[in-house]
Amino acid sequence: MEKIYKIIYSQWQKEVIAYIANKAKHKGKAASCVIKKGGFYPLFFFLNVVIVVIEKLITRNKQEAGDERMPKQSTTEVEKSVRTEDEIYHNIDILVNKSHEALAQMDDFSQEDVDKLCQVIEKVGEDNARYLAQMAVDETGRGKVEDKVTKNTYAAQTIWESMKDMKTVGVIEEDKQEGLMKIAEPIGVIAGVTPVTNPTSTVIFKAMIAMKSKNTIIFGFHPQAQKCCVETAKLIKEATVAAGAPENWIQWIEHPSLTATTALMNNPKVQIVLATGGPGMVKAAYSTGKPALGVGPGNGPSYIEKTADIEQSVNDIVLSKTFDNGMICASENSVVVDKEVYDQVKEAFLKRHCYFLKADEIKLFEEHFIDPRRGTVAGPMAGKSAVKIAEMCGVTVPADTQVIVAEYSGVGPKYPLSAEKLSPVFTLYKAENSAQAFKICTDLLNYGGRGHTAGIHTQNSKVIRKFAFAMSACRILVNSPAALGGIGGVYNNMMPSLTLGTGSYGANSVSHNITAKDLLNIKTVAMRRKPIL
């Protein structure tokens, strides 16, 4: 009982003091003033009474047991925890103020100035693609160096090529005949949140679109990828500042924590949040009360219809699932196959070193591969190789195994492997017909992937159209690997991006691949014309 009392006592004391201190800070008053004049006095008084009672219970317990091994938390320790949180908020304020100063210095930048600096970022990304890829793999223990080189190059070269002719400064469109003119202005200070799965490439991408739209950016890096992300941002900063950019147009949180990232996203002087991460982080971004562009979870299905080119379809899926060990969120998490070609598809996967789990091995994966609290892949397994994941789950597979496949029948909490996997693992379903295939794909999207991506392999244009209308996904990929198809610009003509909107399906504000234009305020000048009655 004493332990329970002490935990409650310590936690309440911290939270009450922190709550009042933060309220006082945001109101610009002393904590005592907030307690007396605000609406917190009754709550504070009540909790203090409770704390006193708990203190007495602890003391009495110790006297009865004669146990002095659990000293009370000192007032100094409590004050220190509050002060530390205050320091975090203060440091964020400093970063944001510096960012606004840089924003003002960029006010006179022309389209040519901005494009020149974007080209500098492109060169940094290309020249350091391998160095940063190796650093990311070494730090996070996830993915493949060669594939991260490709992603860094994509974030630099492909992204720049896609938007180099995009007008983002000043007058971007004028129609004299219609009497309309559009003027672009930067949104302001961006809070850029990055994931552990695609760390360095996301930094390059977000820095590029921030500069292209003449905004400043402050990054909150994932703690498990802090070093490689800081190095990426430093290289970009050094090169762009040398080329004429303001010193603080790009900054980052030096000591990452959930508190610091939350403080950044909620800072009143930050204009927009650009968040890439798990569903919790994206939800937090959308709860800030300001514009936010977030990326929801994937869990995308891929349907191999009976008229599909089997060899190409299987090649595409294996390529997609092995690329950076399946960490692009658009990659196939499940494959649904028409019964007429199921055996042929399975044989094709086996030829490409895909290991099919036995019934008892599926149970081991259900127990170890999926985090029961979150209902998705366990963190330590995301982005690991198929062989390593099997080992972690207690399953022995051949050393040349590329992908792990679980033949499955259901979707939802009772079928753990039907969730998002972010690794070279997928579930395989047999469908009696296209109607059942559509139903399975829809169920998979509804179980953690709404709005993201769905793929189909077929030669039947009518089926493609029906599939597109039926799926609650913002990207419908036809006859292509989903990982590289979803990001655009490689296997299709979608806008290249490393931030993929999922629309209202996934509680996102946009449904397309995010670009620099999403970071602009666009004003419309409308000339008078004769009124139409």
State where each predicted segment sits:
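Residue-level signal for inorganic ion chemistry
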Residues: K214, V273, D338, I389, ...
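Positively charged N-terminal leader segments that act as targeting/secretion signals
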Residues: Q11, A24-F46, A65-G66
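Short, Lys/Arg-enriched N-terminal segments with co-localized hydrophobic residues
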Residues: G39, F46-R69
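N-terminal, intrinsically disordered charge-dense segments
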Residues: K3-G28
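N-terminal Rossmann-like NAD(P)+-binding subdomain of aldehyde/semialdehyde dehydrogenases
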Residues: R60, G66-M181, I209, K351
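ALDH superfamily catalytic-core signature
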Residues: E77-V82, D86-Y89, I204, V282-G412
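Conserved C-terminal structural/oligomerization subdomain of aldehyde/semialdehyde dehydrogenase
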Residues: D67-K72, K80-S81, D107, V395-L533
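Rossmann-like NAD(P) dinucleotide-binding subdomain of oxidoreductase/dehydrogenase enzymes
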Residues: V171-Q312
